[in-house]
Every structure is written in structure tokens, then in C-alpha cells.
Amino acid sequence: MSSRRNDYHYDGNDHQYRSPLKSNVDQNSFYESSYRSRQSYHQRTKTPRSSYDSPSSSTNSKEHNSPYHYRVPSNNSTRASFGAASTDTNVELPKINLPDSSLSSKLQSCKSACENSSQSLLNVEQQYAQQVHFWEKIRTDIYREGLRSDAAVKSLNDFVNNVSF
């Protein structure tokens, strides 16, 4: 509103709006047009009469004031795209690829391979856990037996050395 209001200059003595474009107009017609413009260009109205708008600004007001860009297609491309199948027989429509029957068998084989590999992984983990548990349990027994066998060999050697025939 303020940008359009700057185009009109207010003279306090005449109580009229003076347009800088109408400087060479005779006074009677100027006052009559100004009187009409003052009635239509009130403070409460958001925009002045459309006669003051230039044709370019009134047609482009949507484009300038809107955050979106409006583009009108230059040719009838929208009509051609929607009515192509009915009007033109030479136009090839895009082919729809239906799901292949082998895809389901491939999916099943992949699922079974995944289940088999996960099952074999579980088996390996269980075997490892059993071996670790067994080794932890047996290790102390083996260590004790090693000590006993070393002691037995030593005592046997001592006995052989001490006995005389």
C-alpha cells in the first residue's frame, strides 16, 4: 500500500491527490479526475481502482506477490499428455513390468539360505561354547594330572636310585 501511495503526491492546499503523470492536463479535468480518484482511493481500501494499475502490473500481480511461480504452458502439452492414448494411435504407452515368477523362487531360496546360514552360525556358537566350558572344566584336572605324573616319575626315579640289588 505504501509503495503505491508514494506514486501520488498530496498537496495540503488543494486537498487533492496529484499524479506526477498528469502534470500537463488542464485544471478542470484534473480536479474532476482527482475527485473521483480520491473517492476510490480511500485509506481503508487495500488497492486503488484497477484503472490506475498498468496492464502489466495487474496481470503479473499474482507472480510478483506469490511465493510460488506460476507458469502457463505455451502449447497444449497437458492436453496432449492426457488425451494421447485416445487421439494418437502411434504413441507408445510405457510398458508395465509385471513381477516375474522366478523372483518368488529366488526370494524363497535366499530366505532359506539365510535361515541355513543363521542356523549353522548358531550351531558353531554352541559348539564353541561347549568346547570352552569343557576346556575350563578339564584344564584344572589336566594340570593336576600333570603335576601328579611329574611327581610320580620323580618318585619312581628316586625309588630306583635308592634300591640296590
Swiss-Prot record:
InterPro entries: Tscrpt_reg_Lge1
Listed GO CC annotations: cytosol; HULC complex; nucleus; spindle pole body
UniProt-listed GO biological process terms: epigenetic regulation of gene expression; transcription elongation-coupled chromatin remodeling
Record keywords, A-Z: Chromatin regulator, Cytoplasm, Cytoskeleton, Nucleus, Ubl conjugation pathway
Residue numbers spanned by region Disordered: 1-86
Disulfide pairings: none
Composition bias type Low complexity, residue spans: 29-38, 50-60
The UniProt record lists the keyword Cytoplasm: yes
Compositionally biased region (Basic and acidic residues): 1-17
Biased composition, class Polar residues, residue ranges: 73-86
Cellular localisation: Nucleus; Cytoplasm; Cytoplasm, Cytoskeleton, Microtubule organizing center, Spindle pole body
Top-level taxon in the UniProt lineage: Eukaryota
Record text on subunit structure and interactions: Component of the histone H2B ubiquitin ligase complex (HULC) composed of at least brl1, brl2, rhp6 and shf1.
UniProt function note: Component of the histone H2B ubiquitin ligase complex (HULC) which plays a role in transcription regulation by catalyzing the monoubiquitination of histone H2B to form H2BK123ub1. H2BK123ub1 gives a specific tag for epigenetic transcriptional activation and is also a prerequisite for H3K4me and H3K79me formation.
The protein's name in its UniProt record: Small histone ubiquitination factor 1
Lineage of source species: Eukaryota, Fungi, Dikarya, Ascomycota, Taphrinomycotina
Encoding gene (name): shf1
